[in-house]
């Protein structure tokens, strides 16, 4: 009977020890893991076609270049990322145009940064309708016409004379165990 009790106590001690070891952090210095960082470095015009009036459809291809940094000693895996692209129509007034999503796994070693380029295509025939449907009242209140705003964006994108904003950004790392939000704008002020 005493022997069974000793065995029972040993089993419980082993289970408790295993549970505590399993809860230890993976960081070498005993610290907790820090979330990775996602920062917009720049926006590039990847492909440009001169604006043409409707019913012509003119694509505008933009590349959003991000710096994804891992402040930890152990590698992390970026598995999914999405964000909303907005253009500035008047100072401080941005309108959402697209939400690109990336489903590519990218490993970032500890204490390093990787560059991620996300390419998205905007359509000059779709953008005015998008503005009218999603932000029609706001566009009218600002005294703007969707078609004119889109024409100006297409004609001035090369100089980035208006702001481009990424918002509602979410990056998912390590099988959704780490979720990082981000937003930023370009050109940098």
PLM regions and their residue ranges:
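Sec-dependent bacterial lipoprotein signal peptides
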Residues: 1-23
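Terminal connector regions
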Residues: 122-189
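Short, solvent-exposed beta-strand/turn "edge" segments of beta-rich domains on protein surfaces
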Residues: 46-61, 69-77, 107-110, 157
